[in-house]
Amino acid sequence: MSEGKVDEFMAITGADDAAIATQFIEMADGNLNTAISLFFENGGAALLSSNNTPTPSNSTPMAPTSVDSDADAQLAERLQREAYQQQQPDQDYVRPPDEARHEVLTETSGFPISYGGIGGRFEPLHRVNDMFDEGRPESIFNQRLDDTNTNTYINDNSSDSLDSEEENDDDEYEYVEEPVIELDEDGNIKEYTKLVRKPKTISKEQKLALLFRPPFSIMSKLDLDAAKQKARAKQKWIMINIQDSGIFQCQALNRDLWSSRPVKTIIKENFVFLQYQYESRNAQPYLQFYHLNNKDDLPHIAILDPITGERVKQWNRVVPIPEQFISEINEFLASFSLDPKVPNPTVNEPLPKVDPTTLTEEQQMELAIKESLNNNSSKSNQEEVPSTGEEQKRVQEPDPFSTIEARVHPEPPNKPGITTRIQIRTGDGSRLVRRFNALEDTVRTIYEVIKTEMDGFADSRFTLNDHQREDLIDKLNMTIADAGLKNSSLLLEKLDPEIE
């Protein structure tokens, strides 16, 4: 143990016993700050005051201090005993109140460190990885920043230039020394090596990772509130992209749109760009405030006013073509301004759907009654208008069955591919099997044959259904082939006169 630590300990604490200083430093494993904290937390201040005051005559003399190799517990016990001995002469002794202290809480996002006291260490309140979905393992489709940056505070240091784009080139290319042989002006052979830029030999997995890499070079590593402050300071809009790594369209957005250099350029010049995963911590305030409650709306891109927080433009469920996206951005920048003196166009956003689970019981009842009344009124309006037209049609159009006449149709000879056999069964078990010309005979022909060849149906009303229980009265003018009745079995049912 260095004597410098002992001297520094005694100078800070005011202790005049080097043995005590040595003991506390050993207890703290050589950590001077921890040793000083232990000294004051375990009665060191009382020990100093007792050494500076005269000892009463009737008190027990203080035992000489000795250093014991394993005296941690003994030291604490001795300090406690000595404190009690100082209080014995005056039974009415009252400990003075703790000294008042005034301290200032430091803004945790201002410096990239963690903090903590003895026996504990606390992580920062906001981390860069709060942008990502930590509930899913890191993979090609769920990429994050390098491990060296994941536990730091949210502190955006991104520049407004695209110089950082070279990092992508570094991932794809490398410089290799190659020998070069040349002839100088005198005809002598000159041999040397030079660095040659060549594509790296990378695996298929690495190629996919580069292909679907998020746009880290333009992403601001901030939460939404900090991004608004930065955007106001730099007179820029906020562009936010909400993704879900399980939706391929979100991956296609990284691959096709955010990888475009012209898109990155226009974003860097005019926007503070944020990209959050749907389940991430940073995305939750946006999802709740702007009512993005359905993953079916992903990928979601929006432009926010950093002053008012208004969402002035958005894209949902699409992967814009880079050229079209740039055109829309230019139109937006031409129409909207961050100058408070310049009026902006009115934005009519669709009303968000109310989530019933977030309402109270009374609000849920009111919502249900309101929707029920709206549905009933809309249905009644829809039914009232066409009902008059339908009644007029029924008056004007004759009954299809009344147009069917009893006509004799001779059975055609068998012609493969042209004729077909159809079985007509009744409810009492009787049946009629007959050939028809599938290409020329219509469904009406079947009805006319029934009226002429089956007993009891000439003057009766009946229904004729196919094997799917579909009434064929609506297919009277269709050919047998078009109606799908080749080699079919039809069910014939006579209706009661009362039903007619």
UniProtKB/Swiss-Prot annotation:
Residues found modified as Phosphoserine: 139
CDD domains: UAS, UBA_Ubx5_like, UBX
Location in or out of the cell: Nucleus; Cytoplasm
GO MF annotation terms: ubiquitin binding
UniProt xrefs under SMART domains: UAS, UBX
GO cellular component: cytoplasm; nucleus
Skewed-composition ranges (Low complexity): 50-61, 148-161
Family annotation (PROSITE patterns): UBX (PS50033)
Top-level taxon of the source organism: Eukaryota
Presence of keyword Metal-binding: no
Region (Disordered): 50-70, 142-169, 371-399
Note: Present with 6630 molecules/cell in log phase SD medium.
Cited function: Involved in CDC48-dependent protein degradation through the ubiquitin/proteasome pathway.
Record text on subunit structure and interactions: Interacts with CDC48.
Protein name: UBX domain-containing protein 5
Source species: Saccharomyces cerevisiae (strain ATCC 204508 / S288c) (Baker's yeast)
